[in-house]
Design a protein with these regions (language model features):
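Active-site neighborhood of phospho(di)ester-bond hydrolases with catalytic His/Asp-centered motifs
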Residues: 58-60, 80-90, 115-117, 195-198, ...
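Conserved beta-strand hairpin/beta-sheet module of binuclear metal-dependent hydrolase folds
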Residues: 24-77, 186-198
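Metallo-beta-lactamase
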Residues: 2, 55, 62-64, 120-176, 220-232, ...
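Active-site metal-binding motif and surrounding structural segment of the metallo-beta-lactamase
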Residues: 30, 53, 64-114
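Divalent metal-coordination and catalytic microenvironments
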Residues: 36, 49, 59, 73, ...
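C-terminal regulatory/interaction regions
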Residues: 2, 270-412
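N-terminal non-globular leader segments, chiefly Sec-dependent signal peptides
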Residues: 1-16
């Protein structure tokens, strides 16, 4: 048993705590997971499917680690790459085609043919005009400064709903689904009972609520997972994390992930239909504990509260239901009024510190923020504010929350 299969077994059996092992920490290895199928563990994974007429690659890796993916694929097979499938347009999945293209040119092969959903080109164009914003939010989220890419390898062919590849006698079925993105593709290879989910499965609570990024689609996502489960695949190769082996294991992982999304969706929509405000919805909706206890559904990247906000955004407008927020006063003005009523900004800051020490970190952050807005040039208040956010970051489980809180405590 290789390192990747061993890691899966330990995660599945609870011998590794998912809170200690991020699915985004690559094993930097590859392993044959099914007949003539290699899984490459990288920041974003790639899967190489061998046929009698070359390789089909499901994703090619990030702009930072595409060299590793290329080397791993070549360690698996020296065959030419016939097709590349983008599971979606995120930058950790779509870089590295140029390495195989250069190789094809030097060896006299046909260049790889790149296929993606029809919405991928629009995503690339959006990325090209929002480089600054994407650099900022990803630096905050991942706590590292990386220059956002300026150029992209656009697909040669796109499809709308379904597409079938016939390569070297092997059928690779491609399906569109909206989930983490509006341009997602998942792949199924019936002959090898292989499912490649892209980021529709990532070994943690689904990335359906990212606070800094565009609309996600939890309900459609759940439907796609249910469809995948009906195919009874024997191996699941995810966009992040390790593969899942076993028909029953794959079915359970897909079904429970769908169940979590369905529960959050239905609870949120029921409260919206009653006229509830967003803040009340956020605190009322509860993810089923038995689902969050699953090793593949722990909130280590995204978290249920953020998914609830995204569901609100799906059905509602930008207004949160609080009439005072419709045409709000500047927050600094509100902070100054409250500081004056409470005895000054230092009183607010001191109370924030006390609340943080008692464990009420959410309320502590509100007061720390008000104190800093009321006294923006007070170094002592600024330090206490940073300390409150540092404590909030330590208590957070999701990478997204940690990134935002750490960004205030210690900006990158």
């Amino acid at each position: 048993m290789g390192i990747i299969r061993t890691h899966f077994e330990k995660l599945w059996l609870g011998e590794i705590d998912p809170l200690d092992v991020s699915p985004f920490t690559p094993l930097m290895a590859w392993e044959e997971v099914a007949d003539r199928v290699a899984f490459v563990s990288s920041f974003a994974n790639a899967t190489a499917i061998a046929t009698d007429d070359g390789l089909v690659l499901i994703d090619v890796g990030s702009f930072l680690l595409s060299a590793h993916v290329h080397a791993a694929v070549r360690d698996f097979s020296d065959s030419r790459v016939s097709h590349v499938v983008y599971t979606h347009g995120h930058v950790d999945h779509v870089f590295g085609v140029e390495r195989f293209e250069a190789e094809a040119q030097s060896r006299g092969w046909r260049a790889p043919h790149v296929i993606a959903h029809e919405a991928v080109p629009a995503r690339f164009r959006r990325y090209e005009i929002s480089r600054g914003y994407n650099s900022c939010i990803n630096a905050r989220q991942f706590r590292t400064k990386v220059e956002w890419p300026a150029k992209y390898r656009y697909p040669d062919e796109t499809f709308a709903d379904k597409h079938t590849l016939e390569v070297g006698g092997l059928r690779v079925e491609l399906f569109h689904a909206r989930g983490e993105t509006d341009d997602a593709t998942w792949a199924f290879v019936p002959e090898r009972r292989l499912l490649c989910t892209g980021d529709l499965f990532i070994w943690c609570s689904p990335n359906a609520g990212n606070p800094q990024k565009v609309q996600r689609f939890p309900r459609d996502w759940a439907r796609a997972l249910r469809t995948m489960a009906t195919l009874r695949p024997a191996v699941l190769c995810p966009g992040h994390g390790v593969p899942i082996w076993g028909e029953d294991e794959v079915h359970e992982a897909l079904s429970t992930t769908a169940e979590l999304l369905e529960s959050l969706h239905d609870q949120t929509l029921a409260l919206m239909n009653e006229g509830a405000r967003l803040v009340d919805v956020i605190h009322a909706v509860k993810a089923p504990p038995h689902l969050l206890a699953k090793p593949w559904l722990r909130p280590v990247y995204d978290q249920p509260e953020f998914i609830v906000r995204n569901i609100w955004r799906t059905y509602g407008g930008w207004w949160d239901g609080d009439p005072s927020s419709l045409e709000p006063a500047p927050r600094a003005s509100v902070a100054c009024e409250l500081a004056q009523l409470s005895g000054g900004p230092s009183k607010l800051a001191a109370r924030a510190t006390a609340l943080a020490e008692s464990g009420d970190l959410a309320l502590a952050c509100h007061l720390a923020e008000l104190a800093a807005l009321a006294a923006p040039n007070d170094d002592g208040i600024a330090r206490s504010r940073r300390a409150v956010y540092a404590a909030r970051a330590r208590a957070a489980t999701s990478l997204m929350a940690k990134g935002i809180y750490n960004g205030e405590a210690d900006p990158v």
